[in-house]
Amino acid sequence: MTDLAPIKIVRLDKELPLPKRAHRGDAGVDLHATTDAVIAPGHREIVGTGIAIALPLGTVGLVHPRSGLAAREGLSIVNAPGTIDADYRGEIKVCLINLDPEKPIMITRGDRIAQLVIQKVELVDFEEVEELDDTVRGDQGYGSTGKTA
C-alpha cells in the first residue's frame, strides 16, 4: 500500500492491467482499450476500459486524451474531458475521435487510450435571485479580455 488515497475499483476485464501512473507525481493514470477498433478520419468510437470505480462524494473523475496520441495520431476524446460522477458505478468508456483528415487510427486491445484524473469538486446548490452583484468585468464575455471601451 501507499500513502495515496485508495479508490475502489472493479476490474471487469481481468486480462487488462489496473490503471497506474507512469511516475509517482503524475496526475493521471492510463486507461486501456478492451477491444480492437479502427476509427476512420473524422469518425468516433466508444471504447470500453474494462474498469468500474467508486469515487467518494466530493470527487470527480475526468477522462483526458493522451497527449502523445493526440500529437502523433490525431486521436482525441469527443467530450474532453469526459466526466465520471461520484455516484456512477458502470464501466468507464471513452468516446474517441480521429481528428486526422486522411488516415484511420488503429486501436488494439490493451492500448493506452486515455488518462483518468481524479479531482475534488465543490458541490453547490443554486439560489435564484433577481440580479447579480456588479463587477468590473460585468457581462463582457467572449473576446473581451484586454479590450477597452
Swiss-Prot record:
Keyword terms: Hydrolase, Magnesium, Metal-binding, Nucleotide metabolism
Highest rank taxon of the organism: Bacteria
Pathway(s) annotated for this protein in UniProt: Pyrimidine metabolism; dUMP biosynthesis; dUMP from dCTP (dUTP route): step 2/2
Protein name (Swiss-Prot/TrEMBL): Deoxyuridine 5'-triphosphate nucleotidohydrolase
Catalysed reactions, as listed in the record: dUTP + H2O = dUMP + diphosphate + H(+)
Native species: Corynebacterium glutamicum (strain R)
Signal peptide span: none
Top EC category: hydrolase
Main function: This enzyme is involved in nucleotide metabolism: it produces dUMP, the immediate precursor of thymidine nucleotides and it decreases the intracellular concentration of dUTP so that uracil cannot be incorporated into DNA.
Cross-referenced InterPro entries: dUTPase, dUTPase-like, dUTPase-like_sf, dUTPase_trimeric
Positions of substrate binding: 66-68, 79, 83-85, 93
A Pfam family per the record: dUTPase
Family: Belongs to the dUTPase family.
MF terms in GO: dUTP diphosphatase activity; magnesium ion binding
Cofactor(s) listed: Mg(2+)
GO biological process: dUMP biosynthetic process; dUTP catabolic process
EC number of the protein: 3.6.1.23
Disulfide bonds: none
CDD domains linked: trimeric_dUTPase
